[in-house]
Amino acid sequence: MKLAGATLLITGAGNGMGRELVIGAIAAGAKVVAVDLDKKALATTKQLANADSKSYYPLALDITDSRKVTALPKKIAKQFYPVDILINNAGIIQPFVRINDLEQKAIAKVMAVNFTAPLNLIKAFLPTFIARKKGHIVNTSSMGAYTPVPGQSLYGASKAALSALTAGLFSELIDTNVKVTTVFPGAIATNIAKNSGINLQGMDAGSSKIKMTTPQKAAQIILAGIEKDRPRVFIGQDAKVMNLLTRLNPQYAARLIQKQMKDLLK
């Protein structure tokens, strides 16, 4: 779907890749509903995007609140414009611990943000997409969905679930005008650990241990994928290489990642 003239809803728009998606979309002539928990961060995103009230609608929202999510399509259409493109970008990682040491509270939070919230957003907006005979759903999965990362087993499971959901949705909608895209980012230079409430050295932006794609570059790749209606978008050589390697030699791929990440595992 062409970005110019379209209205996008982007979650996690207050920082990192989400913020860059907003900036890129507005630069391409789109209007954006920017969703994030942090109201101040949304104001900063608006400023960085050089946006005005005609092109930018900030919405401070907890996306795990299913009641508020269900009410979004009518609320946004009434106060702004009907949403054409839904980008489920928001996500969090788990504490870097083994499954046996993962607390139930952390399990519930990761699954709520990474899987249940995107599902509820899809269920909220899909009926209007089908009725209007146009729309695009973009779900941000992860390289972790197909590459085993020690200490991030639940995170990987949540992203694998989202990937499987998106693949099924693509199949269900293949004969409609509603497009579906799964995004598989590799390592992106964002503050995902900090934003997930996790104090962790070596994972966030500025880490020298892992070569990362910039959020700006990642956003450019995603937006280009939307315009070309691509069903799958891989970001970074790491995501592409590990996708192939995991298929060809899963044991070697697991050992390779374990060697890279073992120092982070508590």
Predicted regions and their residues:
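The beta1-alpha1 cofactor-binding region of Rossmann-like NAD(H)/NADP(H)-dependent oxidoreductases
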Residues: K39-K40, A60-A71, Q104
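Substrate-binding pocket helix/loop in short-chain dehydrogenase/reductase
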Residues: V97-I99, E103-A108
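Alpha-helical segment proximal to the catalytic Tyr-Lys
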Residues: P127, S171-D175
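Active-site helix of classical SDR
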Residues: I122, S158
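Residue(s) in the substrate-gating loop at a strand-loop-helix junction
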Residues: S142
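Canonical Rossmann dinucleotide-binding motif of NAD(H)/NADP(H)-dependent dehydrogenases/reductases
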Residues: K2-V33
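SDR active-site lid
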Residues: D175-Q237
